[in-house]
Amino acid sequence: MMARRDPTSWAKRLVRAQTLQKQRRAPVGPRAPPPDEEDPRLKCKNCGAFGHTARSTRCPMKCWKAALVPATLGKKEGKENLKPWKPRGEANPGPLNKDKGEKEERPRQQDPQRKALLHMFSGKPPEKPLPNGKGSTEPSDYLRVASGPMPVHTTSKRPRLDPVLADRSATEMSGRGSVLASLSPLRKASLSSSSSLGPKERQTGAAADMPQPAVRHQGREPLLVVKPTHSRPEGGCREVPQAASKTHGLLQAARPQAQDKRPAVTSQPCPPAATHSLGLGSNLSFGPGAKRPAQAPIQACLNFPKKPRLGPFQIPESAIQGGELGAPENLQPPPAATELGPSTSPQMGRRTPAQVPSVDRQPPHSRPCLPTAQACTMSHHPAASHDGAQPLRVLFRRLENGRWSSSLLAAPSFHSPEKPGAFLAQSPHVSEKSEAPCVRVPPSVLYEDLQVSSSSEDSDSDLE
């Protein structure tokens, strides 16, 4: 029985068993398609095409020789230029180009007629023909010959204004200048006066805006009218007696010999002109010996805008005249002063030269004269003027342009020979030197005394 079995059949069975085992060991999943088949669900990672994987031999990235150029799906005539590198020549134009050429030749023939009509109506010269002398059939000819001027935009040039706008801007500028010129007339007048006048008349010209005081004479006795250039309420009016007393003492120490030669004359300064214009009837009389008098009535000053304050080196004219006329010992108000109002300042004692600081520290002519007051009259008292000397007058005139001009005049003498001792009887404190004849003071002496007083005031302010 064993011999009847065929060995070939046994071998076939082993091959079948091995194939079954291989099939069982294989993983469960989709089976790879054969190489001839393409699966659209697959995508190659190398070339990005669908239908094969990166391991397939159909991928063109692995075998370039087998790669084929992808063909189009279908031809679309009339939308694609199959041969763009071959431009059509002018020798053999196509049918479409022939039609276009005929349409272009027709309007070109009408151009000369149009140009002639335009030349007749507009008067412009005819355009010159092209130098080549043949019609331009190239498509880029319209770029070479422009039909009209092209606008050129530049940022460097400024646009021109209309004449109406220019006139308006000019009127606005002139209006602004006139408004600025009319804003501060006080400041303009003070600047023009200070620039035109000399060093002697600058500070007097600064008071051109204040009203000019009038000289008031009561009875036979002339009064000294002093107008300070810079008025200040309360504090500014109280500084005047102190400067007056200080100047009297300095002048006494500087010129002791002049006091021996000249008699002591009692002079009465008139109150400032603002009291007359405001209607105040109070008289101010200051003594030369005291630093500050007793409570004097405060002058009602006009509050002008932006006026500089009275400096320490500026000396009123009333203090200067008192020292020039012989250093009066006491000041007694005349009977005419009682008519204006009660005098509240008491009589001050004489200040000795020992109490006055020396003036030899500074030369007298080191600084030019800076007068700060405008004196209308400068005269001796009529009771003491026995030699016939005439008083001095300073005349101030206001010009058309707002400036001031001053001139020194000799006024007629105010003598009272009928009653030579009338005023001397009323003032019991007059010294024995008043019996001597009065000596006339020349203007040069007054100018030197004013320089001495200004230099001494500067030295005192520096020491303080």
UniProtKB/Swiss-Prot annotation:
Family note: Belongs to the FAM90 family.
Positions of region (Disordered): 1-42, 69-389, 411-437
Cystine connections: none
Annotated source species: Homo sapiens
Note: Primate-specific FAM90A gene family, thought to have arisen during multiple duplication and rearrangement events.
Residue ranges with Basic and acidic residues bias: 74-89, 97-114
InterPro entries (UniProt xref): FAM90, Znf-CCHC_6
Name of the molecule in the record: Protein FAM90A13
Positions with biased composition (Low complexity): 180-197
A matching Pfam family: zf-CCHC_6
